[in-house]
Amino acid sequence: LAVFLAAAAMVGLTFGQLEAADKYTLRIGTSQTDQAFITRAYMTLADRLMEKSGGRLEVKVFPAGQLGGDEDILEQAIQGAPVAVNTDAGRTSAYVKETGILMMAYFADNYDECLKVTQTETFKKWEQDLATKHGIRVLAFNFYDGPRHFMTNKPINTPADLKGQRIRTIGSEVCVESIAAMGATPVSMSWGEVYNGIQSKALDGCEAQNTSTYPSKIYEVAKYQSKTGHFQLMQALLCGEVWFQSLPQDLQQLLLDTAREVGAETAAQLVAASEESEKAMVEAGLTVIEPDTTPFKEAVKPAYDKLGFTALREQLYKEIGKTK
């Protein structure tokens, strides 16, 4: 019996050593700078996963487009590469169109409304479709980077002021149609090129959130901010379903739980971070304008009709108990 127990113990030790030796690495790519709010959130996630997994799951964060554009990273993830991308509903709409409504102008008024939408059975079904039909695993859809505003070199008080203005926006159909409906000429280019684009006058401005415009120093080349808050930027962390299923079940659950945990924590910190960024930009010379947003909201209504989102918007409002 003693010999059997000793042998069993040796076998158990061997399997334990093999299990401990199974280490996994995930690379997260983002277009934002290393000082951006969302990048620092993913660095927090990396540290926490390393600690909680006992070193079995290592996450490395690559800012400033080091892994390529969002679409390129997502395609790599779908093919099975151990990569994840920080992105938004505009990108996921290329696979499941309906998810894009979360990134339509003036769809939601704040983070809480966006979060409620992601918790509906309708949205959960879309996430399942991303996984089963397109090979995309949503690790978390509750990261938040705040409302987006126009950054330009002329005051924007009404949609008419946007006419003829070449404004950089996210290169997804929902964003392009929203910005066009408000009167601007939407231009798609990587975030890392925006500063030079405005400086060289290839762009007249951009639309983005404070926690990106400040670390990217957009206020140096765009002197006005119009606080339209047209997009509420919910951020998603996406990886490939193939890679996700290659993880042991305990690490799968740990990754999901921790990503959502950090997403919720950082969302709670966003308001203060956004206000600090705005204050710093104003101190550097930025002029902030707070226009009446009613004309902008009216202007984007045709975009909902054009994309077939009007009925879907009403359905989701009903699901989350939102009144117009």
Where in the sequence are the language-model features?
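Short, low-complexity disordered leader/linker segments with a strong preference
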Residues: 1-25, 324
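N-terminal secretory/targeting leader peptides
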Residues: 20-114, 122-124, 128-324
